[in-house]
Amino acid sequence: MVKETTYYDVLGVKPNATQEELKKAYRKLALKYHPDKNPNEGEKFKQISQAYEVLSDAKKRELYDKGGEQAIKEGGAGGGFGSPMDIFDMFFGGGGRMQRERRGKNVVHQLSVTLEDLYNGATRKLALQKNVICDKCEGRGGKKGAVECCPNCRGTGMQIRIHQIGPGMVQQIQSVCMECQGHGERISPKDRCKSCNGRKIVREKKILEVHIDKGMKDGQKITFHGEGDQEPGLEPGDIIIVLDQKDHAVFTRRGEDLFMCMDIQLVEALCGFQKPISTLDNRTIVITSHPGQIVKHGDIKCVLNEGMPIYRRPYEKGRLIIEFKVNFPENGFLSPDKLSLLEKLLPERKEVEETDEMDQVELVDFDPNQERRRHYNGEAYEDDEHHPRGGVQCQTS
Protein backbone atom coordinates (compact mmCIF):
# COMPACT_ATOMS: atom_id res chain seq x y z
CA MET A 1 0.00 0.00 0.00
CA VAL A 2 1.50 3.34 -1.06
CA LYS A 3 1.41 6.32 1.32
CA GLU A 4 0.24 8.80 -1.31
CA THR A 5 -0.60 8.66 -5.03
CA THR A 6 -0.01 12.25 -6.17
CA TYR A 7 2.82 11.41 -8.59
CA TYR A 8 0.85 8.48 -10.01
CA ASP A 9 -2.22 10.71 -10.43
CA VAL A 10 -0.16 13.35 -12.27
CA LEU A 11 0.89 10.73 -14.83
CA GLY A 12 -2.58 9.15 -14.91
CA VAL A 13 -1.41 5.64 -13.96
CA LYS A 14 -2.14 3.20 -11.14
CA PRO A 15 0.34 2.70 -8.25
CA ASN A 16 1.22 -0.76 -9.62
CA ALA A 17 2.07 0.60 -13.09
CA THR A 18 4.98 -1.02 -14.91
CA GLN A 19 7.97 0.94 -16.21
CA GLU A 20 6.57 0.63 -19.75
CA GLU A 21 3.26 2.15 -18.62
CA LEU A 22 5.12 4.97 -16.87
CA LYS A 23 7.18 5.68 -20.00
CA LYS A 24 4.11 5.74 -22.22
CA ALA A 25 2.23 8.05 -19.85
CA TYR A 26 5.19 10.45 -19.54
CA ARG A 27 5.77 10.47 -23.29
CA LYS A 28 2.19 11.50 -24.09
CA LEU A 29 1.91 14.10 -21.34
CA ALA A 30 5.37 15.62 -21.89
CA LEU A 31 4.67 16.13 -25.59
CA LYS A 32 1.23 17.56 -24.84
CA TYR A 33 2.36 20.04 -22.17
CA HIS A 34 5.83 20.93 -23.49
CA PRO A 35 6.41 24.71 -23.21
CA ASP A 36 6.92 24.96 -26.99
CA LYS A 37 3.35 23.74 -27.54
CA ASN A 38 1.73 25.08 -24.36
CA PRO A 39 3.64 28.14 -23.10
CA ASN A 40 1.10 28.63 -20.29
CA GLU A 41 1.47 25.10 -18.91
CA GLY A 42 5.00 25.39 -17.52
CA GLU A 43 3.96 24.34 -14.02
CA LYS A 44 2.07 21.30 -15.35
CA PHE A 45 5.13 20.28 -17.41
CA LYS A 46 7.29 20.61 -14.29
CA GLN A 47 4.91 18.39 -12.25
CA ILE A 48 4.90 15.73 -14.97
CA SER A 49 8.70 15.74 -15.13
CA GLN A 50 9.11 15.53 -11.35
CA ALA A 51 6.64 12.65 -11.10
CA TYR A 52 8.40 10.67 -13.83
CA GLU A 53 11.85 11.47 -12.42
CA VAL A 54 10.90 9.82 -9.12
CA LEU A 55 8.78 6.91 -10.37
CA SER A 56 11.21 5.87 -13.11
CA ASP A 57 13.97 5.35 -10.53
CA ALA A 58 13.45 2.13 -8.54
CA LYS A 59 15.04 3.46 -5.33
CA LYS A 60 13.23 6.80 -5.44
CA ARG A 61 9.94 5.06 -6.22
CA GLU A 62 10.32 2.71 -3.24
CA LEU A 63 11.10 5.68 -1.01
CA TYR A 64 8.08 7.60 -2.36
CA ASP A 65 5.72 4.63 -1.94
CA LYS A 66 6.71 4.28 1.70
CA GLY A 67 6.86 7.92 2.77
CA GLY A 68 5.43 10.10 0.02
CA GLU A 69 6.91 13.33 -1.34
CA GLN A 70 8.19 14.30 2.10
CA ALA A 71 10.38 11.17 2.19
CA ILE A 72 11.90 12.14 -1.18
CA LYS A 73 12.81 15.59 0.13
CA GLU A 74 14.17 14.32 3.45
CA GLY A 75 16.01 11.43 1.81
CA GLY A 76 17.97 13.74 -0.45
CA ALA A 77 16.73 11.91 -3.55
CA GLY A 78 15.40 14.96 -5.34
CA GLY A 79 18.48 15.87 -7.39
CA GLY A 80 17.69 13.85 -10.50
CA PHE A 81 18.46 15.40 -13.88
CA GLY A 82 18.28 18.94 -12.56
CA SER A 83 15.45 20.39 -14.68
CA PRO A 84 12.29 19.33 -16.56
CA MET A 85 13.99 20.06 -19.90
CA ASP A 86 16.93 17.80 -19.01
CA ILE A 87 14.51 14.96 -18.26
CA PHE A 88 12.71 15.60 -21.56
CA ASP A 89 15.96 15.68 -23.54
CA MET A 90 17.32 12.54 -21.90
CA PHE A 91 14.03 10.70 -22.58
CA PHE A 92 13.77 11.74 -26.23
CA GLY A 93 17.47 11.44 -27.00
CA GLY A 94 18.25 15.15 -27.11
CA GLY A 95 21.32 14.98 -24.88
CA GLY A 96 21.79 17.28 -21.92
CA ARG A 97 22.21 20.97 -21.26
CA MET A 98 25.77 21.15 -22.64
CA GLN A 99 24.69 19.62 -25.92
CA ARG A 100 21.76 22.06 -26.16
CA GLU A 101 24.21 24.95 -25.83
CA ARG A 102 26.11 23.76 -28.92
CA ARG A 103 23.10 22.82 -31.04
CA GLY A 104 19.73 24.26 -31.91
CA LYS A 105 16.64 22.87 -30.22
CA ASN A 106 15.33 19.47 -31.21
CA VAL A 107 11.73 19.37 -32.41
CA VAL A 108 9.70 16.43 -31.13
CA HIS A 109 6.45 15.36 -32.83
CA GLN A 110 4.10 12.52 -31.99
CA LEU A 111 2.79 10.48 -34.93
CA SER A 112 -0.33 8.39 -34.44
CA VAL A 113 -0.09 4.96 -36.11
CA THR A 114 -2.20 1.80 -36.23
CA LEU A 115 -1.08 -1.71 -35.39
CA GLU A 116 -1.50 -2.47 -39.10
CA ASP A 117 1.04 0.27 -39.91
CA LEU A 118 3.58 -1.31 -37.55
CA TYR A 119 2.87 -4.78 -38.96
CA ASN A 120 2.97 -3.97 -42.69
CA GLY A 121 5.15 -0.87 -42.71
CA ALA A 122 3.88 2.49 -43.97
CA THR A 123 4.92 5.89 -45.26
CA ARG A 124 3.41 9.08 -43.87
CA LYS A 125 3.86 12.70 -44.87
CA LEU A 126 4.09 15.06 -41.91
CA ALA A 127 3.75 18.84 -42.30
CA LEU A 128 5.38 20.88 -39.54
CA GLN A 129 6.81 24.30 -38.73
CA LYS A 130 10.43 24.91 -37.73
CA ASN A 131 12.83 27.82 -37.21
CA VAL A 132 15.33 28.54 -39.99
CA ILE A 133 18.00 31.25 -40.21
CA CYS A 134 16.69 34.31 -42.03
CA ASP A 135 18.30 34.40 -45.48
CA LYS A 136 17.59 38.12 -45.96
CA CYS A 137 19.94 39.20 -43.16
CA GLU A 138 21.94 35.93 -43.02
CA GLY A 139 21.04 35.52 -39.36
CA ARG A 140 22.37 38.90 -38.22
CA GLY A 141 18.94 40.35 -37.42
CA GLY A 142 19.65 43.61 -39.24
CA LYS A 143 22.17 45.58 -41.26
CA LYS A 144 25.86 44.82 -40.94
CA GLY A 145 27.23 46.55 -37.88
CA ALA A 146 23.75 47.27 -36.49
CA VAL A 147 24.05 44.76 -33.66
CA GLU A 148 25.40 46.29 -30.45
CA CYS A 149 26.05 45.05 -26.94
CA CYS A 150 23.09 45.62 -24.64
CA PRO A 151 24.06 48.45 -22.26
CA ASN A 152 21.48 47.35 -19.72
CA CYS A 153 23.02 43.93 -18.96
CA ARG A 154 26.44 44.49 -20.57
CA GLY A 155 25.98 41.53 -22.87
CA THR A 156 25.21 38.94 -20.19
CA GLY A 157 21.50 38.69 -20.97
CA MET A 158 20.75 38.74 -17.24
CA GLN A 159 19.99 41.48 -14.73
CA ILE A 160 20.81 41.33 -11.02
CA ARG A 161 18.71 43.29 -8.57
CA ILE A 162 19.51 43.77 -4.87
CA HIS A 163 16.48 43.77 -2.60
CA GLN A 164 16.75 44.65 1.09
CA ILE A 165 14.62 42.28 3.17
CA GLY A 166 15.66 43.50 6.62
CA PRO A 167 18.27 45.40 8.61
CA GLY A 168 21.64 44.27 7.31
CA MET A 169 19.95 41.60 5.10
CA VAL A 170 19.73 41.77 1.31
CA GLN A 171 18.45 39.39 -1.34
CA GLN A 172 20.05 39.07 -4.77
CA ILE A 173 17.54 38.38 -7.55
CA GLN A 174 18.64 37.38 -11.06
CA SER A 175 16.24 37.76 -13.98
CA VAL A 176 16.26 37.90 -17.78
CA CYS A 177 17.15 41.32 -19.14
CA MET A 178 13.97 42.97 -20.40
CA GLU A 179 15.85 45.27 -22.76
CA CYS A 180 17.39 42.51 -24.91
CA GLN A 181 15.15 39.59 -23.85
CA GLY A 182 18.20 37.65 -22.62
CA HIS A 183 20.17 37.83 -25.90
CA GLY A 184 22.87 40.19 -24.58
CA GLU A 185 22.62 42.40 -27.66
CA ARG A 186 20.16 44.73 -29.27
CA ILE A 187 19.35 46.24 -32.65
CA SER A 188 17.83 49.63 -33.18
CA PRO A 189 14.27 49.32 -34.58
CA LYS A 190 15.20 51.29 -37.71
CA ASP A 191 18.07 48.90 -38.49
CA ARG A 192 16.16 45.65 -37.94
CA CYS A 193 15.65 43.18 -40.78
CA LYS A 194 12.18 43.60 -42.28
CA SER A 195 11.86 39.87 -42.90
CA CYS A 196 12.59 38.55 -39.38
CA ASN A 197 12.09 41.81 -37.41
CA GLY A 198 15.50 41.37 -35.78
CA ARG A 199 14.84 37.84 -34.50
CA LYS A 200 17.46 36.35 -36.90
CA ILE A 201 15.18 33.39 -37.61
CA VAL A 202 11.88 32.86 -39.44
CA ARG A 203 9.26 30.10 -39.33
CA GLU A 204 9.22 27.75 -42.30
CA LYS A 205 6.87 24.93 -43.29
CA LYS A 206 8.57 21.58 -43.79
CA ILE A 207 7.06 18.37 -45.14
CA LEU A 208 8.78 15.20 -43.98
CA GLU A 209 8.30 11.74 -45.45
CA VAL A 210 8.29 9.36 -42.50
CA HIS A 211 9.05 5.71 -43.26
CA ILE A 212 7.61 3.30 -40.68
CA ASP A 213 9.45 0.00 -40.95
CA LYS A 214 7.83 -3.37 -40.26
CA GLY A 215 8.09 -4.35 -36.62
CA MET A 216 8.62 -0.87 -35.19
CA LYS A 217 7.15 -0.40 -31.72
CA ASP A 218 4.93 2.01 -29.86
CA GLY A 219 7.10 4.85 -28.57
CA GLN A 220 9.95 4.15 -31.02
CA LYS A 221 11.74 7.27 -32.25
CA ILE A 222 12.57 8.11 -35.87
CA THR A 223 15.24 10.84 -36.03
CA PHE A 224 15.84 13.27 -38.88
CA HIS A 225 19.32 14.57 -38.07
CA GLY A 226 19.94 18.26 -38.66
CA GLU A 227 16.33 18.94 -39.66
CA GLY A 228 15.34 20.65 -36.40
CA ASP A 229 15.33 24.30 -35.38
CA GLN A 230 18.21 26.46 -36.60
CA GLU A 231 19.89 29.21 -34.58
CA PRO A 232 22.79 31.49 -35.58
CA GLY A 233 26.13 30.07 -34.48
CA LEU A 234 24.70 26.66 -33.57
CA GLU A 235 24.38 23.34 -35.34
CA PRO A 236 20.77 22.60 -36.34
CA GLY A 237 18.87 20.35 -33.96
CA ASP A 238 17.07 17.16 -34.94
CA ILE A 239 13.44 16.42 -35.70
CA ILE A 240 12.37 13.44 -33.62
CA ILE A 241 9.20 11.56 -34.56
CA VAL A 242 7.72 9.45 -31.75
CA LEU A 243 5.34 6.68 -32.82
CA ASP A 244 2.10 6.48 -30.84
CA GLN A 245 0.17 3.27 -31.50
CA LYS A 246 -3.62 3.33 -31.33
CA ASP A 247 -5.39 0.50 -29.51
CA HIS A 248 -6.58 -2.34 -31.76
CA ALA A 249 -10.05 -3.86 -31.53
CA VAL A 250 -8.80 -7.48 -31.60
CA PHE A 251 -5.06 -7.73 -31.00
CA THR A 252 -2.78 -6.52 -28.22
CA ARG A 253 0.95 -6.40 -28.85
CA ARG A 254 3.35 -7.87 -26.29
CA GLY A 255 6.88 -7.51 -27.60
CA GLU A 256 7.02 -9.52 -30.81
CA ASP A 257 3.86 -11.48 -29.96
CA LEU A 258 0.22 -10.69 -30.69
CA PHE A 259 -2.36 -11.56 -28.05
CA MET A 260 -6.11 -12.04 -28.53
CA CYS A 261 -9.11 -13.53 -26.72
CA MET A 262 -11.47 -15.94 -28.48
CA ASP A 263 -14.97 -16.96 -27.36
CA ILE A 264 -16.03 -20.55 -28.05
CA GLN A 265 -19.17 -22.48 -27.16
CA LEU A 266 -19.22 -25.48 -24.81
CA VAL A 267 -19.88 -27.85 -27.71
CA GLU A 268 -16.77 -26.49 -29.46
CA ALA A 269 -14.67 -26.85 -26.32
CA LEU A 270 -15.67 -30.52 -26.05
CA CYS A 271 -16.10 -31.61 -29.66
CA GLY A 272 -13.61 -29.48 -31.57
CA PHE A 273 -13.94 -26.49 -33.88
CA GLN A 274 -12.52 -24.50 -36.76
CA LYS A 275 -12.24 -20.73 -36.41
CA PRO A 276 -11.13 -18.12 -38.97
CA ILE A 277 -8.91 -15.21 -37.90
CA SER A 278 -8.37 -12.09 -40.00
CA THR A 279 -4.69 -11.09 -39.81
CA LEU A 280 -3.20 -7.60 -39.89
CA ASP A 281 -2.06 -8.07 -43.50
CA ASN A 282 -5.58 -9.00 -44.71
CA ARG A 283 -5.06 -12.76 -44.82
CA THR A 284 -7.41 -15.27 -43.21
CA ILE A 285 -5.95 -18.13 -41.22
CA VAL A 286 -8.00 -21.01 -39.82
CA ILE A 287 -7.22 -22.60 -36.46
CA THR A 288 -8.45 -26.12 -35.73
CA SER A 289 -9.13 -28.02 -32.52
CA HIS A 290 -9.81 -31.66 -33.28
CA PRO A 291 -12.58 -33.70 -31.64
CA GLY A 292 -11.33 -35.11 -28.35
CA GLN A 293 -8.92 -32.20 -27.77
CA ILE A 294 -10.65 -30.52 -24.83
CA VAL A 295 -10.20 -26.74 -24.59
CA LYS A 296 -10.82 -25.48 -21.06
CA HIS A 297 -11.91 -21.99 -20.05
CA GLY A 298 -8.76 -19.86 -19.75
CA ASP A 299 -6.58 -22.18 -21.82
CA ILE A 300 -3.84 -20.38 -23.77
CA LYS A 301 -2.54 -21.70 -27.08
CA CYS A 302 -0.41 -20.13 -29.80
CA VAL A 303 0.23 -20.14 -33.53
CA LEU A 304 3.92 -19.85 -34.42
CA ASN A 305 5.11 -17.20 -36.90
CA GLU A 306 1.80 -15.31 -36.93
CA GLY A 307 2.82 -12.56 -34.51
CA MET A 308 4.52 -9.22 -35.26
CA PRO A 309 7.39 -9.00 -37.74
CA ILE A 310 10.71 -8.56 -35.94
CA TYR A 311 12.21 -5.11 -36.55
CA ARG A 312 14.94 -5.24 -39.21
CA ARG A 313 14.26 -8.99 -39.58
CA PRO A 314 10.81 -8.68 -41.20
CA TYR A 315 10.70 -12.26 -42.47
CA GLU A 316 10.80 -13.52 -38.89
CA LYS A 317 7.69 -13.18 -36.76
CA GLY A 318 6.61 -13.72 -33.19
CA ARG A 319 3.66 -15.81 -32.02
CA LEU A 320 -0.09 -15.30 -32.14
CA ILE A 321 -1.23 -16.12 -28.60
CA ILE A 322 -4.90 -16.98 -28.06
CA GLU A 323 -6.71 -17.17 -24.73
CA PHE A 324 -9.98 -19.10 -24.91
CA LYS A 325 -13.18 -18.11 -23.11
CA VAL A 326 -15.74 -20.94 -22.98
CA ASN A 327 -19.36 -19.76 -23.06
CA PHE A 328 -21.63 -22.10 -21.12
CA PRO A 329 -25.34 -22.50 -22.02
CA GLU A 330 -28.11 -20.88 -19.97
CA ASN A 331 -29.96 -22.68 -17.17
CA GLY A 332 -32.60 -25.15 -18.36
CA PHE A 333 -31.25 -25.42 -21.92
CA LEU A 334 -31.89 -29.21 -21.81
CA SER A 335 -35.01 -31.10 -20.85
CA PRO A 336 -34.63 -33.54 -17.89
CA ASP A 337 -34.54 -36.60 -20.15
CA LYS A 338 -31.86 -35.11 -22.43
CA LEU A 339 -29.89 -33.96 -19.40
CA SER A 340 -29.97 -37.52 -18.10
CA LEU A 341 -28.71 -38.74 -21.48
CA LEU A 342 -25.92 -36.14 -21.46
CA GLU A 343 -24.85 -37.27 -18.00
CA LYS A 344 -24.41 -40.81 -19.29
CA LEU A 345 -22.11 -39.55 -22.04
CA LEU A 346 -19.89 -37.47 -19.76
CA PRO A 347 -17.29 -38.80 -17.29
CA GLU A 348 -18.93 -40.14 -14.14
CA ARG A 349 -19.38 -37.65 -11.33
CA LYS A 350 -18.36 -38.44 -7.77
CA GLU A 351 -21.27 -39.02 -5.39
CA VAL A 352 -21.10 -37.78 -1.79
CA GLU A 353 -22.30 -40.03 1.01
CA GLU A 354 -24.34 -37.88 3.36
CA THR A 355 -24.05 -38.38 7.13
CA ASP A 356 -25.99 -37.00 10.09
CA GLU A 357 -23.13 -34.58 10.85
CA MET A 358 -23.59 -32.84 7.49
CA ASP A 359 -25.88 -29.83 6.98
CA GLN A 360 -27.64 -29.18 3.70
CA VAL A 361 -27.23 -25.58 2.48
CA GLU A 362 -28.52 -23.78 -0.58
CA LEU A 363 -26.22 -22.48 -3.32
CA VAL A 364 -27.28 -19.04 -4.63
CA ASP A 365 -25.84 -16.55 -7.10
CA PHE A 366 -23.17 -14.27 -5.65
CA ASP A 367 -24.11 -10.58 -5.36
CA PRO A 368 -20.94 -8.42 -5.11
CA ASN A 369 -23.01 -5.48 -3.80
CA GLN A 370 -24.51 -7.41 -0.89
CA GLU A 371 -21.44 -7.12 1.35
CA ARG A 372 -21.16 -3.41 0.54
CA ARG A 373 -24.79 -2.84 1.58
CA ARG A 374 -24.31 -4.89 4.76
CA HIS A 375 -21.19 -2.89 5.63
CA TYR A 376 -23.03 0.39 5.07
CA ASN A 377 -26.05 -0.68 7.14
CA GLY A 378 -23.72 -1.86 9.93
CA GLU A 379 -22.02 1.52 10.07
CA ALA A 380 -25.38 3.27 10.15
CA TYR A 381 -26.52 1.00 13.00
CA GLU A 382 -23.38 1.74 15.03
CA ASP A 383 -23.88 5.46 14.38
CA ASP A 384 -27.42 5.25 15.72
CA GLU A 385 -26.18 3.59 18.92
CA HIS A 386 -23.68 6.37 19.63
CA HIS A 387 -25.71 9.28 18.23
CA PRO A 388 -29.50 8.68 18.53
CA ARG A 389 -31.37 10.47 15.78
CA GLY A 390 -34.06 12.03 17.97
CA GLY A 391 -35.55 15.31 16.82
CA VAL A 392 -35.04 18.63 18.61
CA GLN A 393 -37.53 18.91 21.49
CA CYS A 394 -39.57 22.04 22.00
CA GLN A 395 -39.07 23.80 25.31
CA THR A 396 -42.09 23.57 27.62
CA SER A 397 -42.88 25.94 30.37
Curated annotation (Swiss-Prot):
Q: Which residues carry this modification: Phosphotyrosine?
A: 381
- Tissue specificity comment: Ubiquitous. Isoform 2 is highly expressed in testis and lung, but detected at low levels in thymus, prostate, colon and liver.
Q: What is the lineage of its organism?
A: Eukaryota, Metazoa, Chordata, Craniata, Vertebrata
Record-level GO cellular component terms: cytoplasm; cytoplasmic side of endoplasmic reticulum membrane; cytosol; extracellular exosome; membrane; microtubule cytoskeleton; mitochondrion; nucleus
Segments annotated as CXXCXGXG motif repeats:
134-141, 150-157, 177-184, 193-200
Alphabetized CDD domains for the sequence: DnaJ (cd06257), DnaJ_C (cd10747), DnaJ_zf (cd10719)
What is the recorded name of this protein? DnaJ homolog subfamily A member 1
Q: Does the keyword Aminoacyl-tRNA synthetase apply?
A: no
UniProt-annotated binding residues for Zn(2+) 2 = 150, 153, 177, 180
Which residues, in ranges, are excised as the propeptide?
395-397
The membrane topology term of the UniProt record is: Lipid-anchor
Q: Where are the zinc fingers (CR-type)?
A: 121-205
What is the first-listed, main subcellular location in coarse terms? membrane
